From Swiss-Prot:
It comes from Bos taurus (Bovine). Homotrimer; The trimer binds only one molecule of glutathione. GO terms for cellular component: endoplasmic reticulum; endoplasmic reticulum membrane; membrane; mitochondrial outer membrane; mitochondrion. Conjugation of reduced glutathione to a wide number of exogenous and endogenous hydrophobic electrophiles. The lineage of its organism: Eukaryota, Metazoa, Chordata, Craniata, Vertebrata. Residues 3-9, 97-99, 149-155 are lumenal. Keywords: Acetylation, Endoplasmic reticulum, Membrane, Mitochondrion, Mitochondrion outer membrane, Transferase, Transmembrane, Transmembrane helix. Residues 34-62, 124-128 are cytoplasmic. The keyword Transmembrane applies. The modification N6-acetyllysine is found at residues 42, 55, 60. Its EC number is 2.5.1.18. Glutathione binds at residues 38, 73-74, 76, 81, 121. Gene3D superfamilies: Membrane associated eicosanoid/glutathione metabolism-like domain. This is Microsomal glutathione S-transferase 1. Belongs to the MAPEG family.
Amino acid sequence: MANLSQLMENEVFMAFASYTTIVLSKMNFMSTATAFYRLTKKVFANPEDCAGFGKGENAKKYLRTDDRVERVRRAHLNDLENIVPFLGIGLLYSLSGPDLSTAILHFRLFVRARIYHTIAYLTPLPQPNRALAFFIGYGVTLSMAYRLLKSKLYL
C-alpha cells in the first residue's frame, strides 16, 4: 500500500490533485455566486432566509424565482453532476499508472471544458457552446473510465 510520500512522488497523482483543486475552486465559486445573486436580487427559496428582509406577508414577497439566480443555480448543479464523477474516476485513473502526458491531457481538457461551460452558461453564449463544453468534459470522464476498465480492473 502506498504511503503519502509515495503519492507525493507520483506525478500523475500530483497533476490530478492540481487540476482537482482548480475545478473544485471553480465549483466553490459557483456556490458563492448563487448566494451573491440571491442576496443582491433578494430572491430566496426558503421562508427563514427572508426573515432579515421583513415579517409575515412582507417577507413572502422575497419567496420567488429570478431568471439570473436560476441560471447560476443550474450551472452550479451541472457542476455537481459532472465534477463528482470526474473526481472518483480521475482518482482511480491517476492511481492506475497512466502515461503522464495522457493523464495531463485528460485533466486539462476536463478543467478547461468545465470553465468554458460555466462561461457559456452564465453569459449566456448561444448553443452549441455549452453543449460542446459539456460533451468534452463528459467524454474525458468516459475516456478515463474506459482506459481504467480496459487496463487495470478485474472484470
